């Protein structure tokens, strides 16, 4: 996140009743939160932390979610997967008004009259338009069990990242992002100097799956049509999007498998023209 561009965007949109800024943590690494919180207070906007891929992340030694944001959202499955056994999320906030509102909207804004006075719980009302965001007991049980393993998952991903960094540094056509001690590596993102998609196809032929985290919003059809934003409007996002590639990283990977991925990346990079 370019902090200067972030503040410029807020200034440019002040007249549009700007209420909040959503800050996405990419790959499990916190941005410059001190500056972000400062900007939020300066312009009187809420700071919402999108920590879907950052469960367990720390910032200056403190757990994210208990710092200066107005709201933080976590996923109980921080490593993105369409095949996850359980999908659920958690919203944390120290703002009672936001918490009450979230509790209402998570179940179609339905309120019941059941209370300590004995009113029956089949008497209900709908206060607003909500959605079905509450989770099943099975999902909750699985999520709680997985949450207990968070620290061990993080430790293993950091071990895998260390192998990638050691094996892939100084490899031609490959750029490794700067190492950060508090990075929890829900994604391990590298940059390919050119023709990223062909590189990914070559890896796939070797049995190595990769991912693209992420395609900039303004390039997606819905947002492109709705807001008519020029492709070049966000040069940082565009330049990174054209080069980035995510290598496999999850706690179940063995060192042998990680080294196999490295072998294929190195071999393809050496043959890259």
Residue ranges and their predicted role:
Residues 47-49, 93, 212:
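Hydrophobic residues in well-ordered beta-strands that form the structural core
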Residues 49, 53-85, 122-127:
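Conserved active-site segment immediately N-terminal to the catalytic lysine
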Residues 37, 61-62, 89, 149:
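Hydrophobic alpha-helical membrane context
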Residues 42-45, 80:
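A short helix->loop->beta-strand "cap" motif at the edges of active sites that frequently abuts
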Residues 19-20, 44-46, 63, 70-71, ...:
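Proline-centered loop/turn at the N-terminus of a beta-strand
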Residues 67-111, 137:
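Active-site PLP attachment segment
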Residues 4-12, 16, 20-24, 29, ...:
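PLP-dependent aminotransferase class I/II
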Residues 1:
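Glycine-rich, highly charged phosphate/nucleotide-binding loops
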């Amino acid at each position: 996140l370019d902090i200067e561009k972030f503040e410029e965007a807020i200034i440019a949109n002040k007249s549009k009743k700007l209420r909040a800024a959503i800050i996405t943590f990419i790959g499990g690494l916190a941005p410059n939160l001190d500056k972000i919180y400062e900007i939020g207070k300066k312009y009187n906007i809420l700071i919402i932390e999108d920590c879907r891929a950052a469960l367990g992340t720390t910032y200056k030694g403190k757990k994210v979610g208990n710092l200066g944001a107005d709201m933080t959202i976590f996923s109980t499955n921080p490593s993105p997967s369409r095949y996850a056994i359980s999908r659920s999320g958690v919203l944390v906030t120290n703002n009672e008004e936001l918490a009450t509102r979230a509790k209402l909207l998570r179940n179609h804004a339905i309120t019941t009259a059941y209370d300590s006075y004995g009113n029956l719980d089949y008497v209900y009302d709908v206060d607003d338009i909500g959605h079905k965001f509450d989770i099943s007991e099975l999902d909750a049980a699985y999520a709680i069990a997985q949450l207990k393993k968070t620290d061990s998952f993080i430790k293993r991903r950091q071990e895998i990242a260390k192998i990638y960094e050691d094996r892939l540094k100084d490899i031609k056509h490959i750029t490794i992002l700067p190492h950060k001690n508090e990075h929890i590596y829900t994604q391990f993102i590298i940059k390919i100097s050119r023709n990223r998609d062909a590189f990914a196809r070559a890896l796939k032929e070797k049995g190595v799956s990769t991912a693209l985290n992420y395609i900039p919003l303004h390039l997606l059809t819905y947002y492109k049509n709705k807001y008519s934003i020029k492709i070049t409007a966000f040069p940082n996002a565009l330049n990174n999007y054209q080069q980035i590639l995510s290598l496999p990283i999850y706690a179940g990977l063995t060192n042998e498998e990680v080294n196999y991925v490295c072998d294929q990346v190195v071999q393809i990079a050496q043959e890259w023209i």
